[in-house]
Amino acid sequence: MDSDAWEIIHIPEKPSLSPDHQPTVKVYASLIKPRFANTIVRHLCKIAPLEDLRHVKRVKKKILPDCGETQLTVILCLAPEHNDQLSDMPPDVQRLVDPYELSPFITQVCKYAAVSKEEWEEQSKIWPTSFHPPTYNIDGIGGFSEEETQSICKFMRVVIDMAVSGHTPLVNAAVIVDPSVRRIIASETDQVYASSAPRDMTSAETRPFEETGEICLNDTLEKQNGSLSALSCLNPWQWSLQPHDTENCSQWHPLRHASMVAIESSSARDRNLFPNPSKIFDQDHVPPSNTDSPAKKQKTSSQSPDVQNDSREETVRDPSMERPYLCTGYDIFLLLEPCTMCAMALVHQRIKRIFYAFPNTTAGGLGSVHRLQGEKSLNHHYAVFRVLLPDDALRQMTTV
């Protein structure tokens, strides 16, 4: 990597694997006569559905080169991973063997659905599978323009500034941004400990990115060593081991991670700017969430993030304006990969994209330990990116 360049890496829904090294599982299969195919498949779908292998085609068809006849092979059911005995087939499946002249054997099929055409081509060499390219198009998955990259890097600089300025030890920081107008909606740091007094979250200010002058980067994360103990997402249970000032117990809370506080700040802002409850979105009438939905509209200036603007946002709103629904369409920038709790909170808030600088190898929820963006059962999915901060770029920021 160029030591003077910022690099933005997409973190996919599942770990990257070589197309020719796909995980497989064992299944019982058998050649079948074409005239029995429909009947056998109908029985198998009832008694042995392949719920976890929906990407795998139940029947494999092959044209025999010698005679041109069609050869059909059907998956009967899953097989035990550590046992190759045909007698372990479920009784309901075994009852199909004699009537339909089956000859069961054990073979392999790919465990996961392909996420690229290259993976699908390799999978089909083992057993035919289905491939469904993503139907959504989140900005950035296919790469960023130079202008977008600069904007992302500037917001990440705000995160670094917040994390290192006035905090000993280092804390995590979160900045929620409306990408449609490149404005900061909320910016907060960890408030798990009493030393991190909560900020006033009733301000109606929504501000564009501003140059913040010198950023005090005394050291990179790699050199912080023991100073990482206060990063709430890195050590979710560390708070329980620390002494707390009971007289100021209202100033700390074990769940006040940077992401959670930023969400609270964004909500307080919305309540202040859109006080009329009749204009609030009815959750029952919100359109289905999808990852390419536009950022929710705000009454904000569309100025460039480089333009200085110290004025507060107008608190008097057009009566026709409706209160936005949560954080739909927003981006969030974090110093550290969020823990599972914070990652799930960002799902509920309908965040569109997450950018973080450093992986969370102990409790990360977006790639390092868990991978929440790949959980199919969730009703919303965001795109996740890691922003690599080379040392040269960090040193350059200290001289702005």
From Swiss-Prot:
Domain of life: Eukaryota
tRNA processing recorded as keyword: yes
Region (Disordered): 273-320
Skewed-composition ranges (Basic and acidic residues): 309-320
Domain CMP/dCMP-type deaminase: start-end pairs: 250-385
EC number(s) from the headed UniProt entry: 3.5.4.33
Quaternary context: Interacts with TAD2.
Family classification: Belongs to the cytidine and deoxycytidylate deaminase family. ADAT3 subfamily.
Name the record gives this protein: tRNA-specific adenosine deaminase TAD3
Species whose genome carries this gene: Arabidopsis thaliana
